[in-house]
Amino acid sequence: MVLNLALVSIFAHYNTAQGGNSELKFETVYLTNAAPAARLDLVYRPGTVPRHPAILMIGSLKSNQPPDWSTNLVNEGYLLVAFTVDHPPDSDPAKRPQWLYFDERFAHSYVLGGYRAATDVERVAKYLASRGDVNSEKLGWLGSSSTGIPGLAVATRGPRLAAIVAFVSTGAYRQWLETWKPNGLWRGKRDMLWPETETLLRYDPILHVDKMFPTAVLMVNGAEDKVVDPKTARAFMDAARPYYRSDPERLRLVLYEGFGHNLPVDIIRMYAEHWFHLYMHPTDPPPLPAKDAENLTESVRRTQINAADHKKIIRAE
């Protein structure tokens, strides 16, 4: 099949293992209209909704089983899109990053990955728009660590996302790299980044938060994380906050005290379902901005969780 925007190869099969009213459909799509080629793995239930909201991820999907956190969302009509782009490695083998070796090469790989992600997603978004069964106004992102960090670059520089959920991630790239040495991670031969890394840091997400609203951003970090220091996540959110004054509930940072780079496994499903239901529901609109409480009495009233007034609970006059 040839589209105006891409040469697309599609391989699909169905699976009924997850239940629901229709079969799960797994597709592998290759976009080869431009180099490097991109591969998309898609999972969804056809016919559940007229147009699917799509959750984007860097990576791949198994051909017979969606991720555990996603099963309810897929049953409700969400489409999962995991993608990879075949960027060639550096022509100089000595400059290629080594996994978990925190030096200049490793630092450059993250900055370059964020820069590329914002462009790569443009191709993915154009393909999804061409399908006719995807709601292009409800594109979301889910990522954790190495897949969440580039997602925040997409939120500031890529096609408009409706929502993003990023675990143990940061959008303050330079500040994050500066924590590697004090946190005992740095193994570089010198304390300077490469000039090409410095050039790409012009696209550091924290420098472009003015373009992020109204994307609903939820970041969930470990308060004791030494790999992705939570103070850099807070710096990113603090930089974005002035641009969210009209709807501050769209910008949230959750810190788990006592946890580092590994958070409780169950929270991925919990936060993904909650955030995507709230800001990119298959059929419902997102919530309207909440009005500020006009006084202390109103503020206290909003903390009620049932019909009982707090005043009566403590038997105050």
Which residues does each PLM region occupy?
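Alpha/beta-hydrolase-fold catalytic nucleophile elbow
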Residues: 142, 167-168, 256
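N-terminal cap/lid segment of alpha/beta-hydrolase-fold proteins
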Residues: 10-49
